[in-house]
Amino acid sequence: MEEIQIYLQLERSQQHDFLYPLIFQEYIYAFAHDRGFNRSISSENLGYDNKFSFLIVKRLISRMYQQNHFFISLNDSNKNLFCARNKNFDSQIISEVFACIVEIPFSIPYINLEWKKKKIVKPQNLRSIHSTFPFLEDNFSHLNLLVDILIPYPIHAEILVQTLRYWIKDASSLHLLRFFLHEYCILNSFIIPKKASSSFSNFSKRNPKLFLFLYNSHVCEYESVFLFLRNQSSHLRSTSSGVLLERIYFYRKIERLVNTFVKLKYFQPNLWFVKEPYIHYVSYQKIASLASKGTSLLMKKWKCYFVTFWQWYFSLWFHPKRIYIKQLSNQSFYFLGYLSSVRMNFSVVRSQILGKSFLINNVIKKFDTLVPTIPMIASLAKAKFCNVLGHPISKPVWADLSDSHIIDRFWRICRNISHYHSGSSKKKSLYRIKYILRLSCARTLARKHKSTVRTFLKKLGSELLKEFFRSEEDVFSLTFHKASPAFWEVYRSRIWYLDIICLNDLGNPKSQF
């Protein structure tokens, strides 16, 4: 066990300092409002336009520590809800400041670069989620088994604080964070008397920056076991798509962790099975996938090891059913809005040596990505583009818009779906989805003009909608039709549009467009 602790031991000099006094330094707020700093951390989408100030934050923190805690009574619910709203506002301001202080260490390299070059540099902190698929195509086809791991969510606030203790020295900052989360969770339990997940979801919506920092830290701790496996195997390729919550807010991930195996001294499992020579790891949102060439017995040992480790390390009960073992050769898995699988193509080659001919059976593995037709149709039905059977219907709520706006809305949805699922191995199901949207658009226009679809298209011409729903592949075919056959073969193959930076609703069939 001493050898295991050395692998993930983080030196004191490399720990990240949380300087509690920074919260009470006025120049930090001027720094946060600086244009260059805002751009450097992509704050245009993070809400840095909130004009919090040093004086306001100082008063709010003092009031949070000194206030008399109120108790909700059934006779005076309106007054208490008013106080709760004020407290919500206070906590939101404090969380903004806390997240701002947290992001400063990640932004300093870009600020220094701006001063050196005397110009604003916007870091490439966003990656396409489709950058993961080339990794899968190159590597997953050589593997046999897949382990799908569902990371526990939501997380108890105390577990988050305990996780940060391993790489944050400042006790004052941790005390403030613990007190803040404790107050906020209690407050939400009063306002929303539902499950704990509702409280955590409300917290993530009101405090997105702080929530993302805490959640990323939590996921990094869960991935610590995979970092240990990478140290054990030189062939491990650990890749994270970085779409934990649709956008990347971390500029770098913690590569080394402190005392990961602190509590492992209480059990001594035989770790010989982690010597697997070839494994691959990829994660997105709250799902992690680990593929290997190993046997089913090896994967079962991994599952037992993961469950035991996480239960001891996080002091919580980790349900074994959150880890699924799948055979890649005969089972598909849902990944980033695709039904992915490893398909085996069998071919027979006739060979001849010294006048003797014989047949050679070859098996070529290919990574397939299919459009999940049934979940996609369910999403379209939920959004009122078709019924549950997939028959297109009109969109009455859009009938009051102009024709150009109606066509533009349908075109955008169709284009986004076409872009997102451009790398699909088989396009028939994608064409069906596009057909539903196209006919739904025609029915909506016909409903607006109080006519039938046939009469409307006959009056304006059937080419009206074809131009709007022309896919990029059709454009490529028109552009390169007269070019060399090599170009034609390239554009007939799968095309990954790497401008996709988030799952949005396309990757989540349960949500609505």
Curated annotation (Swiss-Prot):
**Could you tell me one molecular function GO term of this UniProt entry?**
RNA binding
Keyword Chloroplast set for record: yes
Enumerate the subcellular locations listed in this protein's record, separating them with semicolons. Plastid, Chloroplast
Q: Which gene encodes it?
A: matK
Top-level taxon of the source organism:
Eukaryota
UniProt entry tagged with the keyword ATP-binding = no
Task: Tell me the protein's name.
Answer: Maturase K
The GO biological-process annotations, alphabetized, read as: mRNA processing; RNA splicing; tRNA processing
Q: Which Pfam families match?
A: Intron_maturas2, MatK_N
**First-listed, main subcellular location of the protein, grouped into a coarse class:** plastid
One annotated Gene Ontology cellular component of this protein: chloroplast
Keywords (A to Z) from UniProt: Chloroplast, mRNA processing, Plastid, RNA-binding, tRNA processing
Described by its record, this protein's role is as follows: Usually encoded in the trnK tRNA gene intron. Probably assists in splicing its own and other chloroplast group II introns.
